[in-house]
Amino acid sequence: MGSKTLPAPVPIHPSLQLTNYSFLQAVNGLPTVPSDHLPNLYGFSALHAVHLHQWTLGYPAMHLPRSSFSKVPGAVSSLMDARFQLPAFPWFPHVIHPKPEITAGGSGAALKTKPRFDFANLALAATQEDPTKLGRGEGPGSPAGGLGALLDVTKLSPEKKPTRGRLPSKTKKEFVCKFCGRHFTKSYNLLIHERTHTDERPYTCDICHKAFRRQDHLRDHRYIHSKEKPFKCQECGKGFCQSRTLAVHKTLHSQVKELKTSKIKC
């Protein structure tokens, strides 16, 4: 079997020597950085899998103090090139500067001394002001208190909430017939309805002097005198002067069809 020749490693950065690859291999022996100091990042031992030019190019150089490399073995530190600089991560400041631990005499003690919620006296504890908030200036007169008052608007009942957007819909007007008490939403419909009680017919035909309650009824009536029949049946071709007369005629055709189908089934 012939021996397989491995391809030569591709240089990552022009300023780095090929000997720095041994540095990446030696980094695997370093202890893993705790996950709480590098959240959402890979461990320090996985740097050999990342192209180094993606970390060094395009970012400002950052010099770390010697204490940062206190855990690096001597064999690894001898392989480090002086020209190699770690990049700065402006979007991860907590990686370089870890969170300060809460000391026993600092704010941690204040958190421990905070009184617990008294469930025995529930009504009193709910209405009583928190002394810790008053000490930090979160009272009703403070800016934080004003913000809390604004946020309390969301807790109001639906009746007390201020209306936003559209104005409340107006109540529909109702027009009541004085003869029978029937309700209408439009005044014109009420006017036509009251003419059935009074038998008022203000629209009169000029030819035959027939009177009508509605103007559209007079318009349909005039087709009789002009012998125009604009409304024609699509089945038999018969013409009509009024649309409502054509509608009645169509019902006759539908009744005839029903009779034929019933005879066929029998």
Swiss-Prot record:
It is found in: Nucleus. It comes from the Eukaryota. One of its GO terms (cellular component) is nucleoplasm. The keyword Cell membrane does not apply. Signal peptide: none annotated. Its main location: nucleus. PROSITE patterns: ZINC_FINGER_C2H2_1, ZINC_FINGER_C2H2_2. One of its GO terms (molecular function) is sequence-specific double-stranded DNA binding. The modification Asymmetric dimethylarginine is found at R116. Keywords: Metal-binding, Methylation, Nucleus, Repeat, Transcription, Transcription regulation, Zinc, Zinc-finger. GO terms for biological process: cell differentiation; cell proliferation involved in kidney development; cellular response to retinoic acid; chondrocyte differentiation; embryonic digit morphogenesis; embryonic forelimb morphogenesis; embryonic hindlimb morphogenesis; embryonic skeletal joint development. SUPFAM superfamilies: beta-beta-alpha zinc fingers. InterPro entries: C2H2-ZF_Transcription_Reg, Znf_C2H2_sf, Znf_C2H2_type. Induction: Transcriptionally regulated by Ikzf1 and Runx2. The keyword Membrane does not apply. Disruption phenotype: Mice die prenatally with severe heart defects including defective atrioventricular junction and venous valves. They never initiate metanephric kidney formation. Nephrogenic mesenchyme undergo massive apoptosis, which causes a disruption of nephric duct elongation and failure of metanephric induction. Coiled coil: none annotated. A zinc finger (C2H2-type) spans 175-197, 203-225, 231-253. Transcription factor that plays a role in the regulation of embryonic heart and urogenital development. PANTHER family: ODD-SKIPPED - RELATED, PROTEIN ODD-SKIPPED-RELATED 1. Belongs to the Odd C2H2-type zinc-finger protein family. This is Protein odd-skipped-related 1. It comes from Mus musculus.
